[in-house]
Amino acid sequence: MDTVAPQRFRAVMSHFTTGVTVVTANSPAGPVGMTANAVCSLSLEPLLLLVCFANEARTLPLIAGTRRFGVNVLAAGQEDLARLFASKLPEDQKFAGVQHSLHDGIPVLDGALAWVGCRLEQLVPGGDHRIGIGAVTAAEGEPLLWYRGEFR
């Protein structure tokens, strides 16, 4: 059987376009978050969402502890937020100066295109990641549309 080097696989998968999100939770020490792009809708009945967390992600045990998290879909122009929440900064520093509000106890980033609130149902091992399955408890967002020559 042929094997593929991890670097080759990563390079090939870099051609797959995906959205960028920040997964957030409200821990006992305050809001926490991490950038994630391995996010997708899993089921409509029941409403389930899937997020992949690196096993070493510092946000993972905090989400596992609270059992609640939010997925903030970033808009064009929010690259700085994506980089900030992907950084190795301590969790308590990531939210310093970041405008957000709490919706049902879940941090929602100002300017996010959309957000989904979830209750963590299951964490499934998947190699060097954990696959988080969340039951959707809230969803908000207004898409930017182009119709008949103007934004709507």
Task: Go through each PLM region and give its residues.
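Basic, polyanion-binding surface patches
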Residues: 1-152
